[in-house]
Amino acid sequence: MANTDAQNDGLREKLVAINRVAKVVKGGRQFGFTALAVVGDGDGQVGFGYGKAREVPAAIQKAMEKARANMKRVHLDGGTLQYAVTANHGSSKVYMQPASAGTGIIAGGAMRAVFEVVGVQDVLAKAIGSRNPINVVRATIKGLTDVDSPDAVAARRGKKVEDIVG
């Protein structure tokens, strides 16, 4: 399901989904392909891309290029999340919570691909509602980018980082 390629720029690439689509025209059906890909550096940066083309390799190439252009920063706590978070996109809802070291990635499908490329090693996650891969990837990335760093939380509350982290 998820395909990994190591490029020379050090980014991890995963192919999440490929779909065959059809456009009905007067002469019959015109087939095309869509590809959903996620790209990350394994250290807190992640992006996703959705490519469409008449051939599978071209769709994958477009998806990878869009993912590289759409990179976002995520604040991680070692190999896990800072705190539990919920995010929505469309009717897809994802719940993610930090896990102790050695737990691994307890997540399914499209969420697992995002966690692997962003550099999360230990997380508990669940997709609720629609499990459409595009919406699940969007919700997962939205949730990860909404997590604030301890520095930002401390500054907002007017406290020291040590008081926040405990």
Curated annotation (Swiss-Prot):
User: Which one of the record's GO molecular function terms can you name?
Assistant: rRNA binding
The record's section on InterPro entries has: Ribosomal_Su5_D2-typ_SF, Ribosomal_uS5, Ribosomal_uS5_bac-type, Ribosomal_uS5_C, Ribosomal_uS5_N, Ribosomal_uS5_N_CS, Ribsml_uS5_D2-typ_fold_subgr
Q: Which GO terms describe its biological process?
A: translation
PANTHER family associated with the record? MITOCHONDRIAL RIBOSOMAL PROTEIN S5
Q: How does it assemble?
A: Part of the 30S ribosomal subunit. Contacts proteins S4 and S8.
Q: What is known of its domains?
A: The N-terminal domain interacts with the head of the 30S subunit; the C-terminal domain interacts with the body and contacts protein S4. The interaction surface between S4 and S5 is involved in control of translational fidelity.
Q: Which family does it belong to?
A: Belongs to the universal ribosomal protein uS5 family.
Listed name of the protein = Small ribosomal subunit protein uS5
